[in-house]
Swiss-Prot record:
Interacts with RssB. This is Anti-adapter protein IraP. Inhibits RpoS proteolysis by regulating RssB activity, thereby increasing the stability of the sigma stress factor RpoS especially during phosphate starvation, but also in stationary phase and during nitrogen starvation. Its effect on RpoS stability is due to its interaction with RssB, which probably blocks the interaction of RssB with RpoS, and the consequent delivery of the RssB-RpoS complex to the ClpXP protein degradation pathway. It holds the Pfam family Anti-adapt_IraP. InterPro entries: SigmaS_Anti-adapt_IraP. Transmembrane segments: none annotated.
Length: 86
C-alpha cells in the first residue's frame, strides 16, 4: 500500500512539472507574439489579425471537439491578438 501511494505521489509530481513546463511555453509564446505584433505597422497588424481570425473560423472543429473547448481557444486567441500583454 505504501508503495502504491509513493508511486502515485511521484506521478503527481511529474504531472505538476509537465504542467509548469507547458505554462512556461505558453507564456513565452505570448511574449513573442506580443513583441512581433508591436513591431508591425498598424495596417499590417490588422491584416494579420483578420487573417488569423478568418482561419480560425474556417478551421472550426467538428463534433469530436467540445464546443466549450473550441470557444475557449477562440477567446484566448482573440484576447492575445486584440489585447496583447504589457
Amino acid at each position: 500500500m505504501k508503495n502504491l501511494i509513493a508511486e502515485l505521489l511521484v506521478k503527481l509530481a511529474q504531472k505538476e512539472e509537465e504542467s509548469k513546463e507547458l505554462v512556461a511555453q505558453v507564456e513565452a509564446l505570448e511574449i513573442v507574439v506580443t513583441a512581433l505584433l508591436r513591431q508591425m505597422a498598424q495596417t499590417d497588424q490588422q491584416a494579420l489579425i483578420q487573417s488569423i481570425e478568418s482561419a480560425l473560423e474556417d478551421a472550426r472543429p467538428g463534433s469530436q471537439v467540445p464546443v466549450q473547448d473550441s470557444e475557449m481557444l477562440q477567446q484566448y486567441v482573440k484576447k492575445l491578438l486584440r489585447h496583447p500583454r504589457n
